[in-house]
């Protein structure tokens, strides 16, 4: 891998990162130049199917987004939010963790549970219940037995250690899931109406903090990996699977809910797919602002991590927090109390440029809007046709 930001990329580099040739050309058009490796890596994860929904967003937009009890439009926040009466709201989310679970079922399933819980409490809601919906292949296969044991244990262990009960679930077996299982985890939480926090960034000069666990090399390019087809050779992608720590997440939950009550938080987002890259770009695009981010300030678990590794890491139990200027010490005190990292790694800027620095060197300069779903990310309308079995199924009559 290139180590210098001066190394310009080619269409071959783009293809290796999962981008199409035409997408590489679009990136050059957006930037007005050829991207360096760090910038291309940023686009590769943000324009992956996992982050951008580029092959499905056209259809998803046709679904209803609002209703009389909805407090956030569908897709507007990191979790749904519905008024349930008496001044309370239910925050909920369901998310798949299929690819990671297919390779490393225990950690894949466990980190799926951790991720959805962070999306819930990052909004200010306290998680109260978890559910799951699972699909596996032929139960006679040894691989299926291995997957079932790992996934069920991963879901149970993370939920138990985190302290949130799994109140229900379902499981089905079919040969079509022999290679790629479906592992869907759901979490629901309760929050008072009007006390939620949005995943947004604004206010020139407001400090940007990373809180929670330290950053390692686990999960790098995880979003791009989750967008690929699984094959028998996918085991080499094991480093793209994240590693979770439910005890750390429990501390992060309590610290997050406490810091929200201080009134010092402008916006907050979990670092899930694409890590720092996704959080900084989505929060900035939503607030129509920019950020200067100092990557060498990020607490790391391993020495000599490269700038693009820090940007793309999907290490778990981390969040990005934008704080009201002048309230830094107040926020720091809360996370110190819970023995968690709380380090200022940047500041909000005017305009919509994301500028990432490493030891004073500008390593990437990209417009936030160009990266995100609903903004500059590609949208495709693929050809489709009705599967043959569907016409046969329609012939079924229950009275027959």
Language-model region placement:
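Glycine/proline-enriched, intrinsically flexible loops and inter-domain linkers
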Residues: 1-400
